[in-house]
Every structure is written in C-alpha cells, then in structure tokens.
C-alpha cells in the first residue's frame, strides 16, 4: 500500500494540526542550513521566527538542543541582525548523526531538523544530492509547518509542478488563489536552495510504502 511521505519523513516534528488551533504559533525558518558539521567545532545556526508564518517575533528566549544516542549538546540563542532573527553557536562534541531541535521560545513552536552529520576534522562527507538537500530544506525553511497536513498551506503531497514555474514562485511567492488563507512569505531563498526544493518536491521521495 502506498502512502504519502510528507507525514512520515520527519519524526518528532510538531505538526501544525495542533498549532493551527492553539491560537498562537510560529514558523521557524533557518537561514543557512548546514549540510554537515565538524565535531568539536562550533557551527552557527541562525533563524527567523514568524508568527503565523508572516510577522517576525522579537524578544524570544530560544535555544538549540542536539542529541546523538546518549550524547547531548545545547546552546542559548541570542538576538541576531534583522527583525525576528536569532543566532546560536552549537558545538557537537563527537562524530555521528545529530538530531537538532530549535526551541523558539514562542509557546510550543519548535522544529526538529533532519539529522545533521558531524564528521571528524579534515573529513568531508559525501555531498548531498539536490533531492536530499531539498528534503532538509523543506523542514529547515519551515515549509513543512504549513504544508505537511494542508491545514494552513496547500497540500503538496504527491503533486508535481512545472520546474520553471515552481522556481519562480519560490523566488517571488504570491497568493495562488483569492481563497488562500494567507500569502506565503518571501523567504529570500538562494538559487541553490530553490533548485534543491524544486528537485525534492518533484521527486519520488515524497512517496513511500508502508
């Protein structure tokens, strides 16, 4: 039996079904999502918290938590440059796959990123494909928050799009239909990020078997 994978790719993610009925919720958008980290060296994570995915939120007390097996690491966020932006310097102490969660400090509006590989200094892991990178960006850029169960944004489950149209839309979002509940914010995506998201959204990765 086939089922759509946008609901199962991201274990531990707080789905918007709760948030959309909780009164106040935020979308976390990571600025530059790293492909990997170097164990023992600080990696900078910055993000913007937007209330209802639109308005930047100021004066939050956020933090970042990372887990790999029995190992844990954490960092306190500080205000960054620009409205609603926060920065944290996180050090992953040992090589391995680390699950990183950004606690926004705005209610339960947190996001758990897909695992990040920490490698030994001097080691370069295999480069991510556009589809792999796009899958990570779909979470890290906050797309999954609004689209994963179609409660807020359109359900993208199993759909395919013209690549040129989709790339143009991601670069300059606009309201698709007058009945849409809200307009997608412009996330300032880089061309490489747009290409990766287009590759992921149009891939077979969205479909898996039980």
Can you name each region flagged by the protein language model?
Residues 37, 119-139:
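Electrostatic cytochrome c docking/interface patches
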Residues 80, 86, 90-94:
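Residue-level recognition of secondary-structure-to-loop junctions
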Residues 97-105:
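Short, aromatic- and glycine-rich surface loops/edge beta-strands on solvent-exposed regions
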Residues 109-118:
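Edge beta-strands of extracellular beta-sandwich domains
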Residues 28, 40-55, 88:
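Beta-strand-rich structural segments
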Residues 51, 62-77:
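Short amphipathic beta-strand segments in non-cytosolic proteins
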Residues 145, 152-208:
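Extracytoplasmic electron-transfer domains, predominantly the class I c-type cytochrome c fold
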Residues 20-44, 125-126:
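Beta-strand-rich domain onsets/edges
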């Amino acid at each position: 039996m086939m089922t759509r994978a946008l609901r199962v790719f991201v274990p531990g993610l707080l789905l918007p079904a709760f948030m959309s009925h909780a009164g106040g919720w935020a979308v976390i958008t990571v600025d530059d999502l790293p492909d990997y980290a170097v164990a023992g060296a600080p990696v900078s994570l910055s993000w913007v918290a937007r209330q209802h995915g639109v308005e930047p939120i100021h004066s939050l007390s956020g933090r970042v938590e990372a887990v790999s097996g029995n190992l844990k690491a954490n960092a306190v966020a500080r205000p960054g440059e620009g409205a609603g932006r926060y920065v944290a310097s996180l050090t992953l102490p040992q090589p391995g796959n680390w699950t990183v969660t950004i606690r926004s400090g705005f209610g339960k509006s947190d996001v758990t990123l897909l695992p990040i590989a920490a490698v030994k200094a001097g080691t370069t892991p295999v480069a991510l494909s556009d589809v792999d990178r796009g899958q990570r960006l779909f979470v890290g850029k906050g797309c999954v928050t609004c689209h994963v169960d179609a409660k807020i944004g359109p359900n993208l489950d199993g759909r395919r799009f013209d690549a040129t149209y989709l790339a143009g839309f991601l670069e300059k979002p606009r309201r698709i239909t007058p009945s849409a509940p809200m307009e997608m914010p412009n996330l300032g995506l880089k061309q490489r990020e747009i290409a990766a998201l287009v590759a992921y959204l149009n891939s077979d990765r969205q479909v898996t078997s039980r």
